[in-house]
């Protein structure tokens, strides 16, 4: 088994190298980086494999062409709109090269702050924030399209609603709370947002904000009916909402009684672990997240929870996943999203 070396030791070694040795190290790093697919290459490869479709109407009848600058363009024969391979993807309207994007994604996987992303990638704070939301929106789309099957663990977690942001642009719906203070109402109330999380035995997941207050069956059905394969087995706590939900999606239900942690070999430990990761990211890594953007942070946490490997491997996988997105919001659409994105 190869011996692992920690980063501080590597940095100490580099600082002790001569100029000639540093040039050799730099050439080796460049060679390794060239072997990794860039985000642009991954996007084009995905388009070639899956086929080009219109990002506006999902039409399959597409005509090739080029604009006056010689760049590849496409025109939908159904709606008549023009688009490129980057339209409605995280790369839309970006002016940076693929190496900057790769550095950005690596820093994102290391939970870098906005200021750290800005300094390392050479972009502004606004650009870093928008890029992060583009990546998160792509992961939301990936999560919403997942089909869960087999044994599915289901449970919900709650967060206080948050209107963190620029209140000069959009006013808060209530008076501000002191940082770290509790809600004005006891227990689970409309001051809290409900986030159901579902994960199957294959590591597929879906989690999002559904409603204010307690979980309910109609909202569960609207949010997750398209993600559950009929005949699956749902394992949940004793909440009554899961009974009607499981019937509506054609799944069997096994509920764990209050006060117990499992029923036979069935439990919801994966979901409980996911809840801890989401809470840690929201409250400690990012020091509070606006409910407006919460779904993106949930999707990113779920993705990290279900993927493992070295940083280059995780970056390659993240690139391969986000280029599949075809409905990523533009900056204007992103800022115009509802303050509390409940299911209606």
Q: What is the role of each PLM region?
A:
Residues 1-344:
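Residue-level recognition of single "structural anchor" positions
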């Amino acid at each position: 088994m190869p011996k692992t070396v920690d980063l501080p030791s590597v940095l100490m070694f580099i600082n002790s190298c001569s100029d000639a040795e540093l040039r050799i190290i730099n050439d080796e790093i460049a060679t390794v980086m060239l072997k990794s697919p860039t985000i642009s290459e991954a996007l084009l490869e995905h388009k070639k494999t899956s086929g080009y479709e219109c990002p506006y109407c999902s039409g399959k009848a597409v005509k090739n062409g080029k604009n006056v600058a010689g760049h590849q363009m496409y025109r939908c024969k159904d709606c008549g709109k023009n688009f490129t391979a980057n339209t409605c993807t995280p790369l839309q309207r970006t002016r940076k090269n693929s190496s900057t994007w790769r550095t950005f994604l690596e820093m994102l996987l290391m939970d870098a702050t906005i200021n750290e992303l800005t300094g390392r990638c050479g972009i502004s704070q606004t650009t870093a924030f928008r890029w992060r939301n583009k990546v998160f929106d792509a992961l939301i789309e990936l999560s919403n399209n997942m089909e869960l099957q087999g044994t599915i663990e289901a449970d919900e977690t709650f967060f206080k609603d948050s209107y963190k942001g620029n209140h000069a642009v959009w006013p808060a719906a209530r008076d501000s709370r002191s940082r770290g203070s509790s809600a004005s109402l006891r227990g689970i109330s409309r001051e809290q947002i409900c986030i159901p999380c579902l994960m199957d035995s294959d590591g597929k997941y879906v989690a999002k904000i559904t409603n204010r207050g307690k979980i309910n069956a109609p909202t569960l059905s609207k949010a997750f009916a398209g993600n559950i394969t009929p005949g699956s087995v749902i394992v949940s706590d004793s909440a009554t909402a899961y009974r009607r939900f499981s019937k509506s999606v054609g799944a069997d239900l096994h509920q764990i009684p209050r006060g117990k942690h499992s029923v036979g070999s069935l439990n919801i430990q994966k979901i409980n672990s996911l809840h801890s990761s989401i809470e840690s990211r929201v409250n400690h890594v990012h020091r509070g997240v606006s409910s407006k953007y919460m779904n993106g942070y949930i999707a990113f946490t779920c993705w990290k929870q279900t993927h493992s490997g070295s940083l280059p491997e995780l970056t390659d996988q993240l690139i391969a996943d986000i280029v599949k997105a075809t409905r990523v919001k533009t900056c204007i659409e992103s800022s115009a999203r509802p303050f509390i994105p409940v299911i209606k």
